[in-house]
């Protein structure tokens, strides 16, 4: 951003007084890196640390950020403030050094709240669908020429980044309930997509505590703000009377203020009508599959309608929507060597969903778009606690595929829990008699084991939130199946 653009932005959004150097501990995370990217473009000196390089750190380095691939006390020297992700422990040497030097240490959401404080904030919360809905709202506002700032938890494929600094007063951000830090945010508009039991360690295992935290988040809206909520979700419907703010509901339900009707899916596109109160009915073509994405689009349209955005811009943005990284992310269709004596091909889709509801939505979208395909899932459970708490739900959902390969649980720093491991889950699924799962003990064996279950008319879903995305990219690079050596080809 040039000097003239910065001056224009400063007329809208004052800079943080006396803050020049901002250091991020865990800067390679999508949420952390997105905020760092916005601040770098605002002209702040950015540094950060993480354990290994990734596309986020590479992008920040190109913007002039100093990145350390270690955690050392000297990394925070001269920092005005240190921003930490929820994954960073209090005994991290950089955190300890910052406290000793009386450098403020704040959570990611506090910095996001500071970015939002002088802007018209739109926050997207909920157990599922936050990232995609954030991208949809951002796409509509950009298509309407409103040039928003956005901070997303996933890659916005149309922009090629997780976050972008705009020149207007609008800031669109994903709001994270996993550590309850979204309570720092004070938006003008808040979307809540759904509420389910997840991250229950944060809420001391008390679902009522989780529900009340969402209510408290919505009460951070000013009295003239607006909550946009999915009335199809039973928990949200239950909570509506407790929300003391203006509400717009959306969903397939007959009483929704923004109602989805006549949904049908053709391949990767959804087609449906959106019926709005006192507004023209919209005939929507959405370039994203699944009924869950129709709901995400309805939320985005509800916000855009409230803002007075032209319907033509809304429809253009949804029809050209390019999606987000690792959300039903199409990586290619690859020809296969002859399988069962017939030539064939397989589609490869990468998806971040790691909760049973998300996995179920992905499976349903795949079945609706490609009903004749052999549906193969490569799944990596995420966290032992989630696997334990949602064990039966996972077993029920994963029986819907035609073939299942399961990697070991991605621990995300957790210790193993007896009975909440992939071997146990495979055993339970096998006992239900619908699919015979294959345990993949070593991720390097995934491609070889996958080749053994392909039929030549396949849709392969690589599913999970851990490091399984690397496996998806590897499968795309090798075109799904390991290539034979010259010696193997010629016997």
From Swiss-Prot:
Gene3D superfamilies: Mur ligase, C-terminal domain, Mur-like, catalytic domain, NAD(P)-binding Rossmann-like Domain. ATP binds at residues 126-132. GO terms for molecular function: ATP binding; UDP-N-acetylmuramate-L-alanine ligase activity. It is an enzyme of class 6 (ligase). The keyword Nucleotide-binding applies. It catalyses: UDP-N-acetyl-alpha-D-muramate + L-alanine + ATP = UDP-N-acetyl-alpha-D-muramoyl-L-alanine + ADP + phosphate + H(+). Cell wall formation. The lineage of its organism: Bacteria, Pseudomonadati, Pseudomonadota, Gammaproteobacteria, Enterobacterales. InterPro entries: Mur-like_cat_sf, Mur_ligase_C, Mur_ligase_C_dom_sf, Mur_ligase_cen, Mur_ligase_N, MurCDEF_pg_biosynth, UDP-N-AcMur_Ala_ligase_MurC. It comes from Klebsiella pneumoniae subsp. pneumoniae (strain ATCC 700721 / MGH 78578). GO terms for cellular component: cytoplasm. The keyword Cytoplasm applies. The gene is murC. PANTHER family: UDP-N-ACETYLMURAMATE--L-ALANINE LIGASE, UDP-N-ACETYLMURAMATE--L-ALANINE LIGASE-RELATED. Pfam families: Mur_ligase, Mur_ligase_C, Mur_ligase_M. Keywords: ATP-binding, Cell cycle, Cell division, Cell shape, Cell wall biogenesis/degradation, Cytoplasm, Ligase, Nucleotide-binding, Peptidoglycan synthesis. This is UDP-N-acetylmuramate--L-alanine ligase. Belongs to the MurCDEF family. It is found in: Cytoplasm. Pathway: Cell wall biogenesis; peptidoglycan biosynthesis. GO terms for biological process: cell division; cell wall organization; peptidoglycan biosynthetic process; regulation of cell shape. Its EC number is 6.3.2.8.
């Amino acid at each position: 951003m040039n000097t003239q653009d910065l001056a224009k932005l400063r007329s809208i959004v004052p800079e943080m007084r006396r803050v020049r150097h901002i250091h991020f501990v865990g800067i390679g995370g999508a949420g952390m890196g997105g905020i760092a990217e916005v601040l770098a473009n605002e002209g702040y000196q950015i540094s950060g640390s993480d354990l290994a390089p990734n596309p986020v750190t590479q992008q920040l380095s190109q913007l002039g950020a100093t990145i350390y691939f270690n955690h050392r006390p000297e990394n925070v020297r001269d920092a005005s403030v240190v921003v930490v992700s929820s994954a960073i422990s209090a005994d991290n040497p950089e955190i300890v050094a910052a406290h000793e030097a009386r450098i403020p240490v704040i959570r990611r959401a506090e910095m996001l709240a500071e970015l939002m404080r002088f802007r018209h904030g739109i926050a997207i919360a909920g157990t599922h669908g936050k990232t995609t809905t954030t991208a949809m709202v951002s796409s509509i506002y950009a298509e309407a020429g409103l040039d928003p700032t956005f901070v997303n938890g996933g890659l916005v494929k149309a922009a090629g980044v997780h976050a972008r600094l705009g020149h207007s007063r609008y800031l669109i951000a994903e709001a994270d309930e996993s550590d309850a830090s979204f309570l720092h945010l004070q938006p003008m508009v808040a979307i809540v997509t759904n509420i389910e039991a997840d991250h229950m360690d944060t809420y001391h295992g008390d679902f009522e505590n989780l529900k009340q935290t969402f209510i408290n988040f919505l009460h951070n809206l000013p009295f003239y703000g607006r909550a946009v909520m999915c009335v199809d979700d039973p928990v949200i419907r239950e909570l509506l009377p407790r929300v003391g703010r203006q509400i717009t509901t959306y969903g397939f339900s007959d009483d929704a203020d923004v109602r989805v009707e006549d949904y049908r899916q053709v391949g990767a596109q959804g087609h449906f009508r959106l019926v709005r109160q006192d507004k023209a009915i919209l005939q929507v073509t959405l370039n994203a599959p699944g009924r869950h994405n129709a709901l995400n689009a309805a939320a985005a349209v509800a916000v855009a309608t409230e803002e007075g955005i032209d319907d033509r811009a809304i429809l253009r943005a949804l029809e050209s929507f390019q999606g987000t990284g690792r959300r039903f992310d199409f990586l290619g269709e690859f020809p296969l060597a002859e399988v069962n004596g017939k030539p064939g091909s397989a589609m490869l889709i990468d998806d971040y969903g790691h909760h049973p509801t998300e996995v179920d939505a992905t499976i349903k979208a795949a079945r609706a778009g490609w009903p004749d395909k052999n549906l193969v899932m490569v799944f990596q459970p995420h966290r032992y606690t989630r696997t334990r708490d949602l064990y039966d739900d996972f077993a029920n959902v994963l029986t819907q595929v035609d073939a299942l390969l399961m990697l070991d649980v991605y621990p995300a720093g957790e210790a193993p829990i007896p009975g909440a491991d992939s071997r146990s889950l495979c055993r339970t699924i096998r006992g239900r008699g619908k699919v015979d799962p294959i345990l993949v003990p070593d991720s390097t064996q995934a491609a070889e084991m996958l080749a053994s279950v392909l039929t030549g008319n396949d849709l392969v879903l690589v599913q999970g939130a851990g490091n399984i995305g690397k496996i998806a990219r590897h499968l795309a690079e090798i075109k799904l199946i390991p290539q034979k050596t010259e010696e193997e080809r010629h016997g």
